[in-house]
From Swiss-Prot:
<comment type="function">
    <text>Catalyzes the first intracellular reaction of sulfate assimilation, forming adenosine-5'-phosphosulfate (APS) from inorganic sulfate and ATP. Plays an important role in sulfate activation as a component of the biosynthesis pathway of sulfur-containing amino acids.</text>
</comment>
<dbReference type="InterPro" id="IPR025980">
    <property type="entry name" value="ATP-Sase_PUA-like_dom"/>
</dbReference>
<dbReference type="GO" id="GO:0019379">
    <property type="term" value="P:sulfate assimilation, phosphoadenylyl sulfate reduction by phosphoadenylyl-sulfate reductase (thioredoxin)"/>
</dbReference>
<dbReference type="GO" id="GO:0004781">
    <property type="term" value="F:sulfate adenylyltransferase (ATP) activity"/>
</dbReference>
<feature type="active site">
    <location>
        <position position="208"/>
    </location>
</feature>
<dbReference type="Pfam" id="PF14306">
    <property type="entry name" value="PUA_2"/>
</dbReference>
<comment type="similarity">
    <text>Belongs to the sulfate adenylyltransferase family.</text>
</comment>
<dbReference type="GO" id="GO:0019344">
    <property type="term" value="P:cysteine biosynthetic process"/>
</dbReference>
<feature type="binding site">
    <location>
        <position position="208"/>
    </location>
    <ligand>
        <name>sulfate</name>
    </ligand>
</feature>
<dbReference type="InterPro" id="IPR050512">
    <property type="entry name" value="Sulf_AdTrans/APS_kinase"/>
</dbReference>
<feature type="region of interest" description="Catalytic">
    <location>
        <begin position="177"/>
        <end position="406"/>
    </location>
</feature>
<feature type="active site">
    <location>
        <position position="207"/>
    </location>
</feature>
<keyword id="KW-0963">Cytoplasm</keyword>
<feature type="region of interest" description="Required for oligomerization; adenylyl-sulfate kinase-like">
    <location>
        <begin position="407"/>
        <end position="527"/>
    </location>
</feature>
<feature type="binding site">
    <location>
        <position position="306"/>
    </location>
    <ligand>
        <name>sulfate</name>
    </ligand>
</feature>
<keyword id="KW-0547">Nucleotide-binding</keyword>
<keyword id="KW-0486">Methionine biosynthesis</keyword>
Amino acid sequence: MPIPTPHGGKLRDLVIRDAPLKQQLLQEAKTLPALTLTARQLCDLELILNGGFSPLTGFLNQEDYNSVVNDLRLSSVKNESNGKGLLWPIPITLDVDETTSKKHSVGDRIVLIDLRDETPLAILTIESIYKPDKKLEAEKVFRGDSEHPANKYLLETAGDYYIGGELQGINYPKHYDYVDARKTPTELRQEFEKLGWAQENIVAFQTRNPMHRAHRELTIRAAQDIGDKAHILIHPVVGLTKPGDIDHHTRVKVYKQILTKFPDGLATLSLLPLAMRMGGDREALWHALIRTNYGVDHFIVGRDHAGPGKNSQGVDFYGPYDAQELLAKYDDELNIKIVPFRMVTYLPDEDRYAPIDTIDVKKVRTANISGTELRNKLKTGDEIPSWFSYPEVVKILRETNPPRSKQGFAILIDNSHKLGDYLSFALQSTLNQFSGERRITKLNAHQANDSFIVGELVKAGSGVIVPTTNPTPIVNVVGNGNSLVVNQKNNNNQASGNADGEFNLSNDDLVAVVDEIVNYLKDQGFY
């Protein structure tokens, strides 16, 4: 099957290649009001500029926004086969605060700036400035629950006004990591031609997690189900994913390693700079359209695709097959075929994986390790069996997810009274007597104000003693499991409400508190 036509019929690569025109835009950019992009906006801009979001040529104006929210369609681009607006399920918007919105008018041109290095990336010509109904957007697009990560971002972080308009691209956002693997839609289509895959089927596998043996098995089976000459694109997200996910550096190292475990010529890897919304069925449709633009004709969609877990009622935000059902509804408008994700399980007696729907689990012994179990094994240093993951992959995961005995921690001590200082010295002396490589560092009050620095020290494996009257920001950075909070007794202002370990301190129990903290650290596996 030939490489599919991009969504909307044309790949929209918006970065100006003409040198004189680019120089003209750079000069103009120096005279224009500047808007520094957020991390999410930066991801969105990159995929607008490189064509990953084709047919979009800018951030949505008000008419397109309303149509996408209510009908999953653009109003400005029509589907030639049915005359309806072209499918587009996720609103791609440039949010700003009210003050910024009042500085601009329709017809103005503004330059969009990279937050990391202040590089001018694009010039936007404003078509509309509007205040969206955020509650309606939350309800229609992400089902309304306040605990949905996209709704939390929408209602608590995003600006209250949107600016829509066409873009002229000056530069792509600059990346310094895994540059060869960050292929644009144009580059990936060219690679498929070079590999000789252009007339053959290609199935894309989306992931935001590390890959293990089961993932290799299911992707190979998906390719085999499509046909003898099908190939695999491992296309992980390295933009913004779900809070708490394993960092993309660790994951990319895993993907590169597992790629070597596929038969020669079967699979390739490319990284997608997408800011996920964890939008379930709508997001699955969005992912499929994006893969069409990247030149893929098949896409694996699994149970609860792009779902963020449980809602505020303790129930999954999305049904297990909502994504597959929505994609089936619009099948005749897609240039990509959906491959249902087939769960596989390990058969210990036969030393092989098999689709779970092909075996009788009452008669055949199976084995599996859940994500929670894997995290616990990494935390405790317990063995991760080779049937589950390759030793090379486990080694990578252990390097960035060491067992508790090698992890750092922060002890946050209320320093509103001298007793906090006494405890800091006592703890540093006590903990330094234990064997091991962990350093015990005591910060001063000025250093303690920088929660980022504390977080980096903990990541590096240090035990950090922090004098502070406001532990919450540090707990949020370090994480509950690696934080201890010591309050002055009867001081109600100190409780963070977040840390796993909280201790009270009074004049007569300094030694007792030291013993409590040491025992807690031992119970948690730090010693």
